[in-house]
C-alpha cells in the first residue's frame, strides 16, 4: 500500500463509522488464512497511532536511509532534544512577521548566490477561509518591510544575515545580500500563492523566485516544491 497513511486507514473513526476503502481493505486482509499487508509512506505518524486492536498498527517497521538529496526524519525528529532548525510559534512574539523576514533573508542568500527559487510553505488549516487569512497577514507583513525598508526591516535583515550558515554555497557578502533583499521588496518580486481546491496554481508559479505558498492537504500530496525551506 503506497502512501499507506492517506486513504487506507479508517478516516471516519471519530464518527464511530468505517470508511469505504478501509472496509474493503479489511475484507481483503481478513479473507485469507495468512497474509502480509505492507504499508509504505514517508509520513507514518497516523499509522503508528493506530491501536493494535484496530488491525492497522504495524507489527514491524523498516526505515530506509534518506537519499543524497533528502535530510531524512532523524534530522527533524532526533531521539533527544529539539533540532536547531525548529522554532515553536508559541515562543515567537510576532510569528508571521518573523517567518516573512526569515524567508526573505534566506531567499536573498540563495538568489544572490545563483540559486533559482526559495519557497516557504504555510499549512495552517484545511479551511480555505484560514488560507485567505494567512495570505492577507503575509501581504501585510511584506508591506511593513517596504514601509520600514531603511529602518527596522534593515536591522532585522542584518540580524538574520549573521544567523545564516549556508552549506551548499558560499555565504554572499552583506552588501550583495542586502541589495537582493531590497530588490525583492522594492520590485514586488515576492509572490503569495494560495493553493487549495478553490484556486488553480500552476507549478511554474513557484519554480523561480521568492514565494510564500499557503494551503491545506493539497501541499502534501502529489506536488513537489523546489527549494522548500520553511
Predicted regions and their residues:
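Conserved P-loop NTPase catalytic core
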Residues: 1, 5-6, 10-112, 119-121, ...
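Conserved C-terminal RecA-like helicase domain
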Residues: 1-4, 11-14, 113-212
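Composition- and surface-driven signal marking solvent-exposed, interaction-prone regions
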Residues: 12, 49-54, 133-138, 225-230
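Residue-level marker for well-ordered alpha-helical positions
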Residues: 23, 179, 216-217
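Catalytic micro-motifs at enzyme active sites that drive phosphoryl/nucleotidyl and oxygen chemistry
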Residues: 25-26, 51, 202-203, 218-220
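Secondary-structure transition/capping motifs at alpha-helix termini
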Residues: 26-35, 113-114, 144-148, 223-226
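A short beta-strand element within the Helicase C-terminal
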Residues: 211-215, 219-230
